[in-house]
Amino acid sequence: MKEATITPFAKPLYIMTKPVGAVCNLACDYCYYLEKSKLYEEQPRHVMSDELLEKFIKEYIQSQTMPQVLFTWHGGETLMRPLVFYKKALELQKKYAGGRTIDNCIQTNGTLLTDEWCEFFRENNFLVGISIDGPQEFHDEYRKNKMGQPSFYKVMKGINLLKKHGVEWNAMAVVNDYNADYPLDFYRFFRDELDCHYIQFTPIVERLSNRADGLRLSSLKQKDGELASFSITPEQWGNFLCTIFDEWVLNDVGNYYIQLFDSTLANWVGQQPGICSLAKYCGHAAVMEFNGDVYACDHFVFPEYKLGNIYQKTLVEMMYSKEQETFGAMKHNSLPQQCLNCSYEFACHGECPKNRFMLSKDGEPGLNYLCKGYYQFFDHVAPLSLIHISEP
């Protein structure tokens, strides 16, 4: 790889890896990724080969311009790949590190965690993300296995194992039409019962449609689509954030970290947010499927957003392609005038493009479905944010 090819790129190249594609032991009602297996129905086994694993790790490390390299293992359910696979991955990372520091994080539903897994994560300094949607009543509403059985107790068992072995972990919670109505019960569960100090709240918004490729979820390019019943409303989202923020800012700042709150403050002071949905541009976080196909984003795994395959193109060629550049710039360039005139445009930059399927007040396309909720939240926190900025 030529030096001149990659030196202009100041940001780390970042690609999430799907070692088992969309394969999962759960069948959560709202999951946006389960159906992606339909894109690969002609392939009997949706598992990453050792050959591809080595090719990806070598090229991914050698494509970086920074001394730190982050590997993110995502699913499907990542732990459906045996432990030996990840041991092999670490061996390959060491083989090709070339003096770079390698970090690993892995997202899991937690139900398959064992002492052996947790010992491995602790010994190798993995950051483990656990998907859990709050207390049992909230979590089990949508997060069930393929037999329709609830998963809460198995997830809690997994969390307790992580704690037992001293594994660093955080929580990723989907906020839906049900649990959004109980923000304090929701937040206090993570704080008081789990003592989870790093929490990510993700609002679920999906549209259902009939696609020729068999997928039921709408892509951004589809103008039709019926809002899925589990989707949160803008009003719910705004009330949810404001209610939790009021509790958090009085008692928990500096001790419990909520990603969206931290990212909002970052935008307020002119820093890069820690979450892509609130950044000005997209395109910095692609995803690679089990067979080497690379897509523009984890939420845009549709044929129309495929960048290529690692066996036909290099990661640098795909990540810095005209297609990916256009995809990334689209987030800002397609904002309707209502957003550009908004006092809080700097705080959300239109949020995630996948949610921008509404018409603005002037009839322009591209308004975010959650706009009213975000505006309510930003308006609520603005006085405190300004006070924080003015402090010496």
Q: What feature does the model see in each segment?
A:
Residues M1-A10, N341:
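Long, charge-rich, low-complexity alpha-helical segments
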Residues F9-E51:
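Canonical Radical SAM [4Fe-4S] cluster-binding loop centered on the CxxxCxxC motif
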Residues V23-Y33, A296-H299, P336-K354:
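Local cysteine-cluster metal-coordination motifs and their immediate loop/turn environment
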Residues Y33-H46, V301, F346-P383:
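Iron-sulfur (Fe-S) cluster-binding segments and ferredoxin-like electron-carrier domains
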Residues I57-T72, R81-S219:
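Radical SAM/AdoMet-radical enzyme domain recognition
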Residues N145-Y153, N160, K164-S277, Y281, ...:
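Radical SAM enzyme [4Fe-4S]-AdoMet core and its adjacent flexible, acidic
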Residues V301-Y344:
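Membrane-interface junctions of multi-pass transporters
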Residues S385-P392:
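Residue-level detector of conserved catalytic or cofactor/ligand-binding positions
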